[in-house]
Amino acid sequence: MTYNIVALPGDGIGPEILNGSLSLLEIISNKYNFNYQIEHHEFGGASIDTFGEPLTEKTLNACKRADAILLGAIGGPKWTDPNNRPEQGLLKLRKSLNLFANIRPTTVVKGASSLSPLKEERVEGKDLVIVRELTSGIYFGEPRHFNNHEALDSLTYTREEIERIVHVAFKLAASRRGKLTSVDKENVLASSKLWRKVVNEVSQLYPEVTVNHLLVDACSMHLITNPKQFDVIVCENLFGDILSDEASVIPGSLGLSPSASFSNDGPRLYEPIHGSAPDIAGKNVANPFGMILSLAMCLRESLNQPDAADELEQHIYNMIEHGQTTADLGGKLNTTDIFEILSQKLNH
């Protein structure tokens, strides 16, 4: 079997971290004996510059045919038209592929807890995953309008939309430490009242998983005061957007966090959670670990290569533990150095 992978380098540091990761994929495929082919497509701001829109039909159709999609990063201050922004291409891609589940693991690597802005004893060994609903909620709700006197956004969830994301979270929790925290604003929002009701109903199908409910403001506090209490967190789109960014800084850098977005069937999208960092683009100083860890998720989930994913992750964790990092993590290596060291380790 030959896997079909679509590469979307995007903007800013996206091309350099994605292209380096693809060089690692070539080494890994030879080592673990699997075949793949790559289609490169412009996306985001780069696509706006070339084609006038962030996501062309050609690119979208290629993504629909793919087994997996690897995305570098998109966006930047260059693209200011509110009706034609790079981020709108990503929203359209998620909606078109029905990528309703976003998985964001956050791990504090052994020996790297000193990098965290929190006290080491609070974060040592922290390992949690946030499961975020990605294609409904206030980002997609209708009606919506904006003028100089009034603005309206709509927050809507159906039972089916809640059930499908909650099942993903329960299954993930069952495969880990068996604890699920559901986050809502049930004390004031009608959508959250339905959310909590559905979570309680679905929980009956997963007796091996312990469930607790937290209001979103309480959860944001506990992520800082006691992050190690969490295993899997599930939440709606807006809450997940905010909480996952909060959680991602606990290891010490946004550059350490990967993510995966998927539907019940069809291709999955893998990307680091950080932005395009246009201020450092092309300077060979970007931290590529988030992108490489996203590649590891792709190897495990879409390319059926769990051993390769484990090896790649372990090499990264060992590098971080021994201070072989870029400057944002206190190290002295540049982007190219990271890829060269990992290439040597994988070829060993």
UniProtKB/Swiss-Prot annotation:
Annotated Mg(2+) binding lies at D217, D241, D245
GO molecular-function terms, A-Z: 3-isopropylmalate dehydrogenase activity; magnesium ion binding; NAD binding
Which pathway does UniProt place it in? Amino-acid biosynthesis; L-leucine biosynthesis; L-leucine from 3-methyl-2-oxobutanoate: step 3/4
- Which chain positions lie within coiled-coil regions? none
Q: Which Gene3D superfamilies match?
A: Isopropylmalate Dehydrogenase
User: What is written in the cofactor note of this entry?
Assistant: Binds 1 Mg(2+) or Mn(2+) ion per subunit.
**Main location, first listed in the record:** cytoplasm
Q: Give the highest taxon in the source lineage.
A: Bacteria
This enzyme catalyses: (2R,3S)-3-isopropylmalate + NAD(+) = 4-methyl-2-oxopentanoate + CO2 + NADH
Under the cellular component aspect of Gene Ontology, which terms does the record hold? cytosol
**Which PANTHER family does UniProt cross-reference here?**
3-ISOPROPYLMALATE DEHYDROGENASE
Q: What does the similarity note say?
A: Belongs to the isocitrate and isopropylmalate dehydrogenases family. LeuB type 1 subfamily.
* Protein name (database record): 3-isopropylmalate dehydrogenase
